[in-house]
Amino acid sequence: MEASHLQIYWHDSQPVYSLTFQKNSANDKLFTAGGDNKVRIWKLNRDENGQNGGVRKIESLDFLGSLTHHEQAINVIRFNSKGDVLASAGDDGQVLLWKQEDPNTQQESVVRPFGMDAETSEADENKEKWVVWKRLRGGSGATAAAEIYDLAWSPDNRNIVVACMDNSIRLFDVGAGMLVCGQSDHGHYVQGVAWDPLNQFILSQSADRSLHVYGVILSSAGVVTGLKLRSKIAKAELPCPGDVLRTNYLFHNETLPSFFRRCSISPCGGLVVIPSGVYKVAGDEVANCVYVYTRSGILNSAGGVKNRPAIRIPSLKKPALMAAFSPVFYETCQKSVLKLPYKLVFAIATTNEVLVYDTDVLEPLCVVGNIHYSPITDLAWSEDGSTLLISSTDGFCSYVSIDTETQFGSRIEPPAMHAEPLDTDESAVAAKNQREAGGIVNMLPVKKIPCNSSDSKKRRIHPTPVDL
């Protein structure tokens, strides 16, 4: 593995809030979004020979274009599974759906920003031209929509769910361009959403210290007609020093210095990695962690204190802000702790570090630190799983290049997915780790580092810098 910076001004020195790779693209195209109200398109030029131990470094970048129809900062961008529609959303409260313009399309079809004609528009200088296909707005009017922090596509690309600053999530029908429903069950900003790849549930994570599980309501024709709140995960009975069980909060409160809490569901739908976790180490002293739930744990949860995670990944020096699974499946080299017939890889980002794990051993394969001066905002894996891109509020992006065959083993075809819960023998997991008090286990035998989460008690809209 090799980590490096990409030293360019991605968004005119403004923060970079989100990034994503275009799926099913013949080229390595990266899209970034930031505080300059623009989405920008880049082509990654790699070392195809892999002269650095099989690692394909990014040698240079080509700028391909800017998308300029947002009126305020853009917080999230995501492609649908086909890779032909890009969704972007941000502080202006609208979701824009972009499609690449056919070179044979007449110039008059391009929707230009107000006040710009064909001669003055920045769009005419782009190597690629993307047009706004649809605009999605929540609320009853143009000014009623709240700021959007995160979004997720449905697996069939028919719907989009967004996380809003007014404590709600909103569900849109992409084809109709209409709002299907909204849910206002959270007590604070919603900072992350994820859609189950098997289309059974949606997860939303909020600054109110909870994760909500919503069941997806489908019509007989398979059309999403609404959402139903299944459970709220906020507290659980967790093992504490002295082999006792105590009811504690699972997640950080609103003082967490980040816009985002981006949880991630594995591409098979069997695992959920949830950031911003905390746990008691002694008295009122808390430490940072990440919680891992199985699919059955999510679907069968009642939302009570006994809804314990399957695994706790502890000993993070700073709060975890987001997680992201690689889309690639690998042959398992040994018996998986979770009894998976394949190996998955995921990354966790704290405010100042990125850690890469696999599901075989659940120990860090690498820890990348001191890469940014201010908090990390997003993670994006390339389609082949060989590159992990990282964005930050310092206005820069960095990356980790990986020789996947050496680090992870041979790739396999994705297994056939079905909508039945994944059964996990949690007692076997507990026995393996010699833990009998409770269903949550520490997989990493490393020193626990307390979190200084009490340094700041004020409520904030914008994150404040942290000391690295």
Curated annotation (Swiss-Prot):
GO terms for cellular component: CAF-1 complex; chromosome, centromeric region; cytosol; nucleosome; nucleus. It comes from the Eukaryota. It is found in: Nucleus. Component of chromatin assembly factor 1 (CAF-1), composed of MSI1/p50, CAC2/p60 and CAC1/p90. Interacts with RTT106. WD repeats lie at residues 11-52, 69-108, 143-182, 185-224, 371-413. Acts as a component of the histone chaperone complex chromatin assembly factor 1 (CAF-1), which assembles histone octamers onto replicating DNA. It performs the first step of the nucleosome assembly process, bringing newly synthesized histones H3 and H4 to replicating DNA; histones H2A/H2B can bind to this chromatin precursor subsequent to DNA replication to complete the histone octamer. Plays a role in the maintenance of heterochromatin. Keywords: Chaperone, Chromatin regulator, DNA damage, DNA repair, DNA replication, Nucleus, Repeat, WD repeat. This is Chromatin assembly factor 1 subunit B. The keyword Cell inner membrane does not apply. GO terms for biological process: chromatin organization; DNA repair; DNA replication; DNA replication-dependent chromatin assembly; nucleosome assembly. PANTHER family: CHROMATIN ASSEMBLY FACTOR 1 SUBUNIT B. Belongs to the WD repeat HIR1 family. SMART domains: WD40 (SM00320). Present with 2130 molecules/cell in log phase SD medium. It comes from Saccharomyces cerevisiae (strain ATCC 204508 / S288c).
